[in-house]
């Protein structure tokens, strides 16, 4: 893991299995590794190998019409020194794939504090 990238990562995570209260909250920092999320070091390693884990689904993406549930997750903070404000939902195949790519952070609808 690059130290500069790790030092510039500080995330606040909120997850709701219903899209409404109650929300489950967790944090993650990388460089040094810290926060309340389980498996912090592994999460930092996974993030360091990802190109753009918080990028939205492209507007021109062709997505399957599949519903994955009412879950909502929000990730706010910095990643590699860049501001992050990302919302994850499971409303179609593209959004489900995007959610699954960072499920080590946001879980599968349950609390990320495992």
Describe the residue ranges of each PLM region.
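N- and C-terminal low-complexity/disordered segments
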Residues: 1-114
């Amino acid at each position: 893991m690059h130290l500069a990238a790790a030092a510039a990562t500080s995330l606040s995570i909120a997850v709701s299995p219903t899209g409404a209260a109650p929300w489950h909250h967790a944090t993650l920092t990388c460089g040094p590794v810290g926060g309340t999320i389980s498996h912090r070091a592994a999460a930092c390693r996974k993030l360091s190998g990802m190109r753009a884990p918080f990028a939205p689904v492209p507007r021109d993406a062709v997505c399957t019409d599949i519903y994955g549930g009412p879950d909502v997750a929000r990730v706010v903070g910095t990643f590699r020194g860049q501001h992050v404000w990302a919302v994850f939902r499971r409303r179609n195949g593209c959004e489900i794939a995007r959610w699954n790519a960072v499920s080590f952070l946001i879980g599968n609808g349950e609390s990320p504090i495992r």
